[in-house]
């Protein structure tokens, strides 16, 4: 699946002197928490991108936000965002046709620890709505891409054609002191 990320997200466990990484962290956390300023900012950026890429043809496509841990979190994080983006970009809104049952714990993956537990977690898609539609998936973060690929497969199974994924940020990794040295060397930060 083709993917496009707006920003690069460096997890807190990595040191950085780059103010852009710090600002992106704040934006991602605020968006995930449903903060109005972050939701509005991200909606503005996404509307501008979709309008630039598709213009008047945007109405031929469906924007659907990827499922998150629970229906409550999905509604809180994405429903107003999706309604605003789709109204302003003149693209169809598929987020109201995603239902999440149960809950999935957050995925925390690193070399030493993997957590991904589900408790009756199931995502249900309205096949009548998605059948034959050209879909763009939106999510806040992409790390490995596994969650987006799983969701793409579910959409494919109900007859949708997924054109790609649009992400607020892609997780990148820094390598400690050498990473800070590279940031200074390439003038991402000046002392």
Model-derived regions, located:
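PRPP/pyrophosphate-binding module of the type I phosphoribosyltransferase fold
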Residues: 100, 105-191
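Glycine-rich phosphate-binding loops at beta-strand->alpha-helix junctions
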Residues: 67-77
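Short glycine-rich phosphate-binding loop at a beta-alpha junction
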Residues: 58-69
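Active-site-facing substrate-recognition patch
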Residues: 1-58, 99-131, 171
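Charged helix-capping and loop-helix junction motifs
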Residues: 77-83
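Hydrophobic alpha-helical packing residues
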Residues: 85-89, 155-156
């Amino acid at each position: 699946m083709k993917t496009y990320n707006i920003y690069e997200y460096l997890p807190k466990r990595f040191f950085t002197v780059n103010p852009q990484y710090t600002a992106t962290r704040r934006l991602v956390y605020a968006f995930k928490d449903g903060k109005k300023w972050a939701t509005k900012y991200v909606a503005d950026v996404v509307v501008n991108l979709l309008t630039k890429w598709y213009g008047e043809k945007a109405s031929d496509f469906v924007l659907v936000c990827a499922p998150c841990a629970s229906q409550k979190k999905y509604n809180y994080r994405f429903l107003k965002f999706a309604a605003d983006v789709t109204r302003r970009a003149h693209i169809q809104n598929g987020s109201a046709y995603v239902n999440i049952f149960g809950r999935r714990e957050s995925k925390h993956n690193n070399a030493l620890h993997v957590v991904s537990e589900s408790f009756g977690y199931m995502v249900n898609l309205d096949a009548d709505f998605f059948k034959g539609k050209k879909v763009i998936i939106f999510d806040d973060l992409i790390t490995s891409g596994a969650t987006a690929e799983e969701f793409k497969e579910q959409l494919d199974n109900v007859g949708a054609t997924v054109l790609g994924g649009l992400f607020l940020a892609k997780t990148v990794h820094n390598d400690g002191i050498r990473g800070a040295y590279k940031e200074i060397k390439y003038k991402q930060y000046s002392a």
